[in-house]
Structure formats: structure tokens, C-alpha cells
UniProtKB/Swiss-Prot annotation:
Pfam families: IGPD (PF00475). GO terms for biological process: L-histidine biosynthetic process. GO terms for cellular component: cytoplasm. InterPro entries: IGPD_sf, ImidazoleglycerolP_deHydtase, ImidazoleglycerP_deHydtase_CS, Ribosomal_Su5_D2-typ_SF. Belongs to the imidazoleglycerol-phosphate dehydratase family. This is Imidazoleglycerol-phosphate dehydratase. The keyword Lyase applies. Pathway: Amino-acid biosynthesis; L-histidine biosynthesis; L-histidine from 5-phospho-alpha-D-ribose 1-diphosphate: step 6/9. The keyword Amino-acid biosynthesis applies. It is found in: Cytoplasm. CDD domains: IGPD.
Amino acid sequence: MRESSQIRETTETKIKLSLQLDEGKNVSVQTGVGFFDHMLTLFARHGRFGLQVEAEGDVFVDAHHTVEDVGIVLGNCLKKALQNKEGINRYGSAYVPMDESLGFVAIDISGRSYIVFQGELTNPKLGDFDTELTEEFFRAVAHTANITLHARILYGSNTHHKIEALFKAFGRALREAVERNAHITGVNSTKGML
């Protein structure tokens, strides 16, 4: 089974995270940031991933360090779980509606970190979650996993729905990208490596 775990401790956060790419039954998320827990759970369920997260952070300041560091650790675990990337689709994309909102995510497991994030989040805060942290999370994942990630909110009026559509689309796009494909021999690249 393709899986990875990491514990990362800094003066700001302590993150313990385990990711299973091929087994999606066990999802448990506790970061101390309620809305973020909800989004990570949606990502895992819609991507059919196993995900266990325990995070302690300086949320008395704000949720920035916790959200960003969870993204860093998730990216590291994704990179490690994929190992040599042989036999996977490499690319994945998904449109996901959430009522009036529509989110889109496209992923290339390319070995090159890059992110494009587009979307207007009109409500600056949802519970104790600063909505601008949505982009920070995706940036952290993309950079540490060495993937190219395009995340776009096409339209919508409810900020919760917009972010939820993105996290669900992220799960579905990543599922497609990491899926093993019997028609792909070796690495899905003319270079012979990623």
C-alpha cells in the first residue's frame, strides 16, 4: 500500500499526519481549527484517501501556522507515498459544484512545484479560519509535494461553498492523478523520469 507518515515539530506547531493513497476508510482530523478540519475531511473522503491528522499550533495567535504546516506535512507525505511515480496517471482534474459555487482543480505530479490560485473569497473569516489561508494551504502542499496545482473558483456567492468546492475538487483531481493505470509502463513522461 502506498502510504506515508510524518511528525513535524517547530516552535509554532506540532503536526502528526498519516496518508494512505489506496485505503480511504480511516479519516480522522483534529487541528484545532474547526472549518479546516471539515475541509480536510472532505478532501480525504472525496479523494478516497486515508488521512489521520493531529495538530497543535499557536492558534491563540491565529490559524496561519497550523494550516500552512499541515499543508507542508501533507505535501511531504504525498511525495513519499508516491515513491518513484511509476504507473500512475500523473494528471488529474475535477470540477465540483457546491450549490451555487463551482470549483476546479487540475494537478500534474510533475516533480516541479507551481501553483496558480484564482478566486474571490469575499468573507474574510469562517469561524476561526481566515479564508486567505485556503491559498496558503494549497501553496504549501504544491511546493513540498513538487506538484503543479491549478485551483480556481469559477463563481459562487457563499464563501464556505466556494472553499468546500475547491477542497472536494482537490481530492477528486488528486485521486485521478495518483491512480495506477495498467496502460502506463514506467513513468508517464517522455523524459523517463519525473
